[in-house]
A protein has these predicted regions:
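Extracellular/oxidizing-compartment recognition motifs
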Residues: 1-182, 191, 208-209, 228-233, ...
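Carboxylate/His-rich catalytic cores and anion/metal-binding grooves
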Residues: 73-82, 148, 190-215, 268-280
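A glycine-rich, coil/turn loop motif that links secondary-structure elements
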Residues: 182-188, 237-240
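Helix-terminus loop motifs that line ligand-binding clefts
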Residues: 86-95, 207-284
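Generic anion/oxyanion-binding catalytic loop in active/binding sites
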Residues: 111, 154, 185, 199, ...
């Protein structure tokens, strides 16, 4: 910045913004935790300096890569994918990426500690030789709640469906609420919550998590009673009335599953405010 460059900008009059009142509440549920450790099961060359590592299945978590000595200033790219069609040709480089920059003196460890990833395939681009499988570790991350139910029968297809549902839901519950997807938006959509709550609350003891999630909905309720489609609500997201009504349906379901009526007692006024708002927008 300099006087010359600032004078050349197109300055406009100041706009006064009105900031609505918002509550700031603590996270009242278990923290995230790394629950296990996994290494890739195979590696394949995908170009002169690219290698794709297969984790064997999709995971959501922290990735740690032990890097060799890399030329000073050279950038090593890490790309993530949950699937590809064939021959690695449709691997979406740059869609979801991290970068490691070498110092030319010693190796280092890349860690996605502050940005978990959801993927099965990891492409590392910029190295002349593949890393040992043990150099790459994926540690699944989930909210550290307790299990609530198990299922097993003589039908292997039903067992597979149960295991898929169990692992999917566990992978989606991060940071005190359930996300729509762990690799893109990571938003707590009310529509997704309504569809998943009966199963999620049956498989796991997530009563504290729902106390936290419903609190987030109350925190971001607007002054006129309107509700967003996601909570927490960092930016606008799509949905409809079914999304906004999550506070009502989830509180009721929490009482049915756990006998815990605190959500209905605590947030009944918020529910009434939203219903009044919704009714004000209805015609006939």
């Amino acid at each position: 910045l300099s006087t010359e460059t600032l004078d050349g900008l197109d300055w406009r009059p100041v706009t006064v913004a009105r900031i609505p009142d918002h509550a700031a509440s603590p996270q009242m549920c278990e923290l995230n935790a790394k629950v296990s450790r996994h290494h890739p099961v195979s590696v394949h060359r995908a170009g002169d300096d690219s290698f794709i590592y297969d984790m064997g299945r999709n995971f959501v978590g922290q990735t740690d890569v032990v890097m060799p000595v890399v030329e000073d200033g050279k950038k090593i790219a890490l790309y993530y994918e949950d699937y590809y069609l064939k021959d690695y040709a449709d691997f979406r480089d740059g869609e979801y990426s991290d970068y490691y920059v070498g110092n030319g003196k010693s190796g280092g460890v890349f860690s996605s500690k502050f940005n978990y990833k959801g993927y099965r395939y990891l492409k590392i681009k910029g190295l002349e030789a593949p890393l040992a499988l043990e150099s790459i570790t994926l540690s699944p991350v989930m909210t550290d709640f307790e299990g609530g139910a198990d299922f097993e029968c003589s039908d292997e297809d039903l067992n597979a469906i149960y295991n898929m549902s169990h692992e999917t839901l566990a992978s989606l519950v991060l940071g005190g609420y359930m996300v729509d997807c762990p690799q893109i938006e990571r938003l707590g959509y009310g529509g997704d919550g309504n569809a998943s709550t009966p199963v999620l609350q049956t498989l796991f003891n997530v009563s504290p998590l729902y106390m936290n999630w419903i609190q987030a909905w109350a925190d971001c309720q607007r002054e006129n009673g309107d509700m967003p489609h996601t909570a927490p609500n960092p930016y606008s997201a799509g949905g409809g009335p079914f999304w906004c009504a999550f506070m009502i349906a989830a509180s009721w379901q929490t009482w049915l599953n756990y006998g815990d009526e605190r959500l209905m007692e605590r947030y009944y006024p918020n529910m009434c405010r939203w219903l009044d708002y919704a009714e004000s927008k209805c015609v006939d």
